[in-house]
């Protein structure tokens, strides 16, 4: 059930909740409480009413409504009343539930509902069957609520003999899920035991509706990928390793789903199952926990809340991570028709259920005692809104019908009070715990709960609050805690643990508040309804979008968490500017993002160094904690490591940088930049990666950029679905097998816009305009390459790489210019940046060295410096470039060629004649002060150096560079010549000029007579020459 539920929760979360409750309560519902179920069953058995309800519920889990009714039925008269009540409630859910029930197998609420509704239409003909009735209830839902109620009652009666009803339900479901429905039928038939059994025999007893996506569920997909089959409207599962495809939920996933369901069922079931189910569930729980003691329910509530919260968060994480918030919201949504029907039905049911509610409330009361639990369903939804959202839907839908109105008010009040408390608590937690570590998970809940939108939404509807939460980047942080993602249960437990703690505290308070709020709840019902309508619409839209994205292979897995963070930040900022986002919420989220980046920075920075951000130069600088020395370049704790990481960072950062530009938030920019860096770093070097590793869960997620860590992207088209077993629909045509794309993202690391040019050390930076830097860079790399010639080994390497570099450098400079490279650029780099080209060419400390040389010393020295640099490059540059490309080449090589010290600027004599010694690093590692530019010649000098360098490079230009330049010229030429204004003469003249320039640049001019100055007596000589031949 949990799995189902989880799925259901993520999938149809809010919308389907309605129907899922029934089904959930039915197979999933009971399953969710499989643990409680047995207890509940036993306990329920003990508690005659509870027991029968539980048993019935368990038995008729599928017919959750009936189950609910059954519980009351068991009580006997309550049974009927309750049944009626249940029907109402159930009707709420029942209609969906009925459908869901048959579809109950599809533990995915909304999706199930969709399937169920479809089924209901199909099954409407089967209305005669009670299962059909339940489905009919669906059909009737649209058609006639009364008839649906009658059907429900009949079904409930049948359920009273639960087994028959369950089987019937089972028969009905088959149409919807492509997978064998019989199992589902069997599960309902199994009765309580079945629910438990179904849990146990997940695939067989417990049936997961393949129409429901696992996307929102916090489960570890492992080698399995969920593939949507348009023909059947169901998901099939594809094992990317074995290429196995199955319509059934693979055992690996089923176990997780069930596990999740265990967590959520209680809350989800309670909430979703229209408090009838809640009643059953809660009854069971209550019975289990305290038979009917409120403390028991409270406990249950807490448990539920925790579970739900955990589950929800896990779900929401996985959901958000896998599908995204939209998907999470969407999944629960039913098709519009269904949604509308549900709404109509819900409204009617709500009116009718007002009475049943009182009856149901008897059960519900216990439930309500647990009520807080049930209300908590809303509250829980609040706290656990992720599942809650679904649950809220169901609660709102079913709960609205019965307890919902009362509980809604109560919940609303409770929610508001609880939320306020939660807010305070969560904020405290957030600020205390949340801000640094799992703040995202907690802050997710706490923030969303406490945060503007969430809280309001929460008060109005816990669901939305959860949604907000789900939407919040927490998903990233949550997802970042891989624990949540990997094992929904673990994640739920891990993340949920924090949440659950908060939620527990909150639940306690909520419980108190809820009781007081119960009264107020009713008033909020209308609001809730409006919210529900809105939710449904949102869900619908989200579902559609999510489905489309999913089909197109667009998902979270293809981007790193930092990218997600960047996008989320940008989106939030945009929303905030529009006035649609609470400023405090935005601030909190930005702080969370900054915290995540901070963690990344901490983990990425070598020991003994601290990483700081220079706002003016928009780049990182590093301070040696012992010496207080600061530098732009990534700490040389191992120069190579530094270079590597730096470079990697540079590469990755440039991407981020570009994105960052879009990002208004400096924090977000930083964060995005850093993140990429770390990702790159990690992928590219073991050393770096180890440094990152500490963040493990979060970082691992962050590193999702790195293909290695990424599971195959959904982009890989799964193999065609297997023929659905026992499922009426013919096997869908196999979707085309997707080419595996999982690692496509990594290429980004190669960014050549790395901004190989680092911002010059503070003060020098502005000297080199970006463009000049770019050109210079190209030239420099050429000259470097040439100078490299002096050092044969490096020469080759450099030459080979230089061309790449020059191009990449140019691009990089552009990127970097706008956004300074973060990590990769070394302090020296900053210096050279002024020199820019040289350092760009190398992109490393050695570059900086050569650059500074060139700048400081003159062209001659430059040449020397360059050669030195190229040497440095030779070993380092090539690797460095490689690292850009591969992110895996350790720059260690570089170190040997040029001692880091040298690179830094101590450079040996060759390095430089004039390079000014790098300014002493600021004594204190205070982050704010940008490190003094090491060896950065004064700006003027730098410029001169650059010019000299440029000249020199002009004399020695690698052929590739020449080619590139000539091509560029030709292109420009074409552009110019294409204009009709230019006449042939001007074009010819231009070409001549260009040729001259090329000759000069390439150094061929020295040997070309056309470039020799004519002697003053050239006319006379010319005459003489002409005369000579004639004579």
UniProtKB/Swiss-Prot annotation:
Tissues where this protein is expressed: Ubiquitous. Highest levels in spleen and thymus.
Modified residues (N6-acetyllysine): 294
Compositionally biased tracts (Acidic residues): 400-414, 742-757, 971-984
Keywords assigned: Acetylation, Isopeptide bond, Phosphoprotein, Repeat, Ubl conjugation
Chain intervals with Basic and acidic residues compositional bias: 418-430, 499-518, 643-663, 985-994
Up-regulation conditions: Up-regulated by p53.
Biased composition, class Pro residues, residue ranges: 712-741, 913-939
Domain WW residue range list: 218-252, 603-637
Cross-link (Glycyl lysine isopeptide (Lys-Gly) (interchain with G-Cter in SUMO2)), chain numbering: 339, 352, 527
Modified residues (Phosphothreonine): 176
Annotated segments matching region Disordered: 1-102, 116-143, 166-205, 355-518, 629-681, 712-813, 900-994
Comp. bias (Low complexity): 41-73, 83-92, 469-482
InterPro entries named among the record's database cross-references: WW_dom, WW_dom_sf, WW_domain_protein
Subunit: Binds FMN1. Interacts with the Arg/Gly-rich-flanked Pro-rich regions of KHDRBS1/SAM68. Arginine methylation in these regions has no effect on this binding.
Stated name of the protein: Formin-binding protein 4
Organism in which the protein naturally occurs: Mus musculus
């Amino acid at each position: 059930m949990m799995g189902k539920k989880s799925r259901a929760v993520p999938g149809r979360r809010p919308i389907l909740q309605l129907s899922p409750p029934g089904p959930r309560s039915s197979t999933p519902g009971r399953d969710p409480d499989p643990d409680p179920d047995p207890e509940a069953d036993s306990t329920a058995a003990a508690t005659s009413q509870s027991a029968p309800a539980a048993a019935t519920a368990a038995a008729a889990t599928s017919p959750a409504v009936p189950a609910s009714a059954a519980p009351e039925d068991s009580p006997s008269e309550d049974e009927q009343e309750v049944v009626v009540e249940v029907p109402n409630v159930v009707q709420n859910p029942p209609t969906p539930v009925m459908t869901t029930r048959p579809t109950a197998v599809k533990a995915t609420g909304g999706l199930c509902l969709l399937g169920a509704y479809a089924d209901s239409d199909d099954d409407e003909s089967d209305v005669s069957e009670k299962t059909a009735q339940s489905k009919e209830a669906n059909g009737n839902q649209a058609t006639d609520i009364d008839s649906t109620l009658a059907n429900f009652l009949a079904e409930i009666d049948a359920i009273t003999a639960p087994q028959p009803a369950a089987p019937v339900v089972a028969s009905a479901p088959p149409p919807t899920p492509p997978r064998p429905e019989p199992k589902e039928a069997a599960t309902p038939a199994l009765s309580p035991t079945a629910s438990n059994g179904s849990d146990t025999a997940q695939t067989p007893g417990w049936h997961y509706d393949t129409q429901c996506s696992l996307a929102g569920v916090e489960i570890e997909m492992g080698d399995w990928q969920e593939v949507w089959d348009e023909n059947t409207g169901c998901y099939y599962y594809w094992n990317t390793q074995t290429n196995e495809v199955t319509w059934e939920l693979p055992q690996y996933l089923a176990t997780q789903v069930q596990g999740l369901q265990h967590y959520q069922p209680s809350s989800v079931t309670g909430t979703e199952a229209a408090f009838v189910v809640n009643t059953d569930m809660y009854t069971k729980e209550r019975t289990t926990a305290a038979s009917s003691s409120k403390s028991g329910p409270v406990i249950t509530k807490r448990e539920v809340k925790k579970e739900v919260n955990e589950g929800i968060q896990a779900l929401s994480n996985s959901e958000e991570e896998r599908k995204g918030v939209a998907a999470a919201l969407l999944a629960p949504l039913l098709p519009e028709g269904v949604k509308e029907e549900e709404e109509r039905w819900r409204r009617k049911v709500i009116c009718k259920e007002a009475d049943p509610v009182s009856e149901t409330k008897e059960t519900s009361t216990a439930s309500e005692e647990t009520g807080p639990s049930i209300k908590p369903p809303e509250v829980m939804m609040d706290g656990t809104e992720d599942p809650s959202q679904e649950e809220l839907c169901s609660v709102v839908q079913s709960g609205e019908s019965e307890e919902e109105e009362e509980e809604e008010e109560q919940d609303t009040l409770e929610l508001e009070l609880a939320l306020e408390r939660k807010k305070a608590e969560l904020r405290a937690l957030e600020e205390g715990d949340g801000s640094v570590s799992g703040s995202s998970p907690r802050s997710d809940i706490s923030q969303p709960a406490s945060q503007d939108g969430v809280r309001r939404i929460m008060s109005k509807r816990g669901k939305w609050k959860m949604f907000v939460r789900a939407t919040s980047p927490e998903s990233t942080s949550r997802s970042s805690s891989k624990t949540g993602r990997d094992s929904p249960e673990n994640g739920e437990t891990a993340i949920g643990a924090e949440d659950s703690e908060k939620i527990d505290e909150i639940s306690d308070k909520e419980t108190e508040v809820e009781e007081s709020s119960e009264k107020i709840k009713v008033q909020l019902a209308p609001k809730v309804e409006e919210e529900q309508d809105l939710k449904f619409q949102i869900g619908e839209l989200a579902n559609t979008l999510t489905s489309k994205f999913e089909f197109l292979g667009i998902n979270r897995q293809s981007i790193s968490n930092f990218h997600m963070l960047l996008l989320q930040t940008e989106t939030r900022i945009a929303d905030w500017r529009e006035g649609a986002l609470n400023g405090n919420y935005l601030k909190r989220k930005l702080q969370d993002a900054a915290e995540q980046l901070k963690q990344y920075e901490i983990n990425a920075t070598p020991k003994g160094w601290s990483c700081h951000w220079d706002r003016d130069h928009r780049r990182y600088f590093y301070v040696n904690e012992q010496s207080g020395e600061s530098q732009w370049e990534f700490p040389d704790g191992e120069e190579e490591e530094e270079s590597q990481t730096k470079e990697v960072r540079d590469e990755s950062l440039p991407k981020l940088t570009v994105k960052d530009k879009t990002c208004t938030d400096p924090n977000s920019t930083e964060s995005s930049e850093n993140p990429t860096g770390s990702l790159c770093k990690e992928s590219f070097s073991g050393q770096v990666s180890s440094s990152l590793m500490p963040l493990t869960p979060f970082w691992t997620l962050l590193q999702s950029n790195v293909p290695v860590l990424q599971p195959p992207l959904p982009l890989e088209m799964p193999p065609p679905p297997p023929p659905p077993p026992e499922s009426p629909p013919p096997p869908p045509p196999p979707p085309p097998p997707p080419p595996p794309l999982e690692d496509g993202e990594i290429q980004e690391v190669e960014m050549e816009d790395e901004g190989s040019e680092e911002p010059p050390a503070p003060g020098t930076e502005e000297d080199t305009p970006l463009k000049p830097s770019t050109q210079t860079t190209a030239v420099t790399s050429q000259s470097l390459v040439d100078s490299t010639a002096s050092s044969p080994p490096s020469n080759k390497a450099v030459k080979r790489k230089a061309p790449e570099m020059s191009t990449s450098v140019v691009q990089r400079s552009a990127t970097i210019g706008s956004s300074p490279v973060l990590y990769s650029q070394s302090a020296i780099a900053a210096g050279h940046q002024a020199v820019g080209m040289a350092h760009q060419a190398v992109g490393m400390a050695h570059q900086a060295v050569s650059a500074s040389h060139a700048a400081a010393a003159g062209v001659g020295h430059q040449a020397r410096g360059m050669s030195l640099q190229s040497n440095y490059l030779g070993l380092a540059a090539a690797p460095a470039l490689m690292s850009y490309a591969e992110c895996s080449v350790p720059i260690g090589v570089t170190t040997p060629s040029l001692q880091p010290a040298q690179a830094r600027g101590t450079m040996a004599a060759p390095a430089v004649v004039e390079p000014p010694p790098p300014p002493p690093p600021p004594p204190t590692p205070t982050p704010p002060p940008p490190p003094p530019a090491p060896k950065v010649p004064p700006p003027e000098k730098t410029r001169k150096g650059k010019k000299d360098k440029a000249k020199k490079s002009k004399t020695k230009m690698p052929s590739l560079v020449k080619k590139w330049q000539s091509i560029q010229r030709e292109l420009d030429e074409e552009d110019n010549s294409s204009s009709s204004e230019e006449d042939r003469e001007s074009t010819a003249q231009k070409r001549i000029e260009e040729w001259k320039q090329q000759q000069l640049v390439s150094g061929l001019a020295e040997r070309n007579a056309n470039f020799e100055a004519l002697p003053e007596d050239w006319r006379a000589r010319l005459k003489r020459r002409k005369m000579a031949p004639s004579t």
